[in-house]
Amino acid sequence: MEQINNFYSTILKSSHPFLLSIHLGGKAVPLIFYVLGSLFMGFTAQFISVVLLLAFDFYITKNISGRKLVQLRWWYDTTGKQSSSFTFESYKQFSPGPSINPIDSKLFWWSIYLTPIVWIVFGIMCILRLKLFYFLLVSVGICLTGINAYGFRSCDKWEPNANEDSNNSWFQLPTIPGLDNLNALSQVQSFFQSRSG
């Protein structure tokens, strides 16, 4: 009981205790529904519930809690007009404002990195137990939490004054020669999007 009181007092020391609670709850609730959902609902209902909870967590983390708790924001550029596909917004590019609360930062980063690891462990367990349909559900969890972790890590390492080549130098996807047509396809898609909008 003392650990719960200590955790509660830690949350209260946050700059945004309600938002931090929603952020941590958004990480925990899909995991709880995955572990305990089969006790009180069928697989289809559990699958849909967990995917919707993961999507809610992805949206809240990417657009609200990341912006408020650690002053970072990222999005993926789908227009194909930029050479870098990720666009970042960071406290580093603006004049100094309110400082980042260390409790907010610590709990945010721990939850961002720990959640994909937990989903990966669940994925390994699904493979070992040959539960392929549950593995599909876990794969959604790995993808959504992993993309958020990747985006926020890239945003945190991003330097606004550095050239574009050094922004993504810690991890780059390989260039595959046969996939040059994807660039042309994205240009055609952006052409039609600009005409319709």
Curated annotation (Swiss-Prot):
Ligase is among the record's keywords: no
Q: Which UniProt keywords apply?
A: Glycoprotein, Golgi apparatus, Membrane, Transmembrane, Transmembrane helix
Q: Where in the cell is it found?
A: Golgi apparatus membrane
Q: Does the keyword Transit peptide apply?
A: no
Q: How does it sit in the membrane?
A: Multi-pass membrane protein
**Annotated family:** Belongs to the TVP23 family.
Query: Which named protein is this?
Result: Golgi apparatus membrane protein TVP23
Which organism does this sequence originate in? Vanderwaltozyma polyspora (strain ATCC 22028 / DSM 70294 / BCRC 21397 / CBS 2163 / NBRC 10782 / NRRL Y-8283 / UCD 57-17) (Kluyveromyces polysporus)
Q: What taxonomic lineage is listed for the species of origin?
A: Eukaryota, Fungi, Dikarya, Ascomycota, Saccharomycotina
